[in-house]
UniProtKB/Swiss-Prot annotation:
InterPro entries: Aminoacid_DH-like_N_sf (IPR046346), NAD(P)-bd_dom_sf (IPR036291), THF_DH/CycHdrlase (IPR000672), THF_DH/CycHdrlase_cat_dom (IPR020630), THF_DH/CycHdrlase_CS (IPR020867), THF_DH/CycHdrlase_NAD-bd_dom (IPR020631). The gene is folD. GO terms for cellular component: cytosol. CDD domains: NAD_bind_m-THF_DH_Cyclohyd (cd01080). It comes from Prosthecochloris aestuarii (strain DSM 271 / SK 413). This is Bifunctional protein FolD. It catalyses: (6R)-5,10-methylene-5,6,7,8-tetrahydrofolate + NADP(+) = (6R)-5,10-methenyltetrahydrofolate + NADPH; (6R)-5,10-methenyltetrahydrofolate + H2O = (6R)-10-formyltetrahydrofolate + H(+).
Amino acid sequence: MMLIDGKKVSTDLKNELKTRVEELKAKAGCVPGLTVIIVGEDPASQVYVRNKAKSCKETGMNSTVIELPAETTQEELLGKIEALNQDPDVHGILVQQPLPSHIEEYAVTMAIDPAKDVDGFHPENVGQMVLGNLDKCFISCTPFGILELLRRYDIETRGKHCVVVGRSNIVGKPMANLMLQKLRETNCTVTVCHSATQNMPELTRQADILIAAIGRANFITREMVKPGAVVIDVGINRIEDPSRKSGFRLAGDVDFDNVAEMASAITPVPGGVGPMTIAMLLKNTLQSFARSHNL
């Protein structure tokens, strides 16, 4: 069984991005800038934002965090976004989820300039991705990171059966669409399973590549996996664990220890897909910068 080490790949990628940032800085006289907006004081969101800022610094990019109180109105937030849309020093805009209930996520997504939508959530970017115009869009960071893992580990995908478990707008839907594309890392026959799927184990056992993104700890069991399958675990679930100082431990959507005995390759949690998401966010930001300077 081969362990797909997202932590190592993300470190390698960030080193490559750092070199590229230095090259582009010499040509443009400035560096890429990412601005993250966080509304409210969700502890998990604050951790994610700190990690993004740290990664920006490591690659030589500028990072700005705008912290807004939970009572910020939707109009105020949209005004902040519009100002960033017009700022030439900002090449990537990210609004950290979740948002307070009185703010409509779709309105926020629509407000971000597609050319700075480095999360890849704007309908213009999603549409270009579905059409296969990948050089004209930003790809959602988690699916993009999974493609990078498949490429760097030279996992054969052409003509393989890929089963995606989950249909979220952030992972499941874009992942399924990407695996259909005619790329070296994709070109699969794709099945999508979700909460209403009947006989799910029968379908997942057909997968040469199984991608779990359902948000339920240890949902994918040994009995649901074909021997020799490649298993990609997107889930990050907190499970109570009194033996840990934090009081919890992280678990994926896959029962790792048992499924690893069946798989030819598998991603761990933590240290698999998670680190890749931030790395691809930085890659998208660098791409936005390069486009804005015609580099």
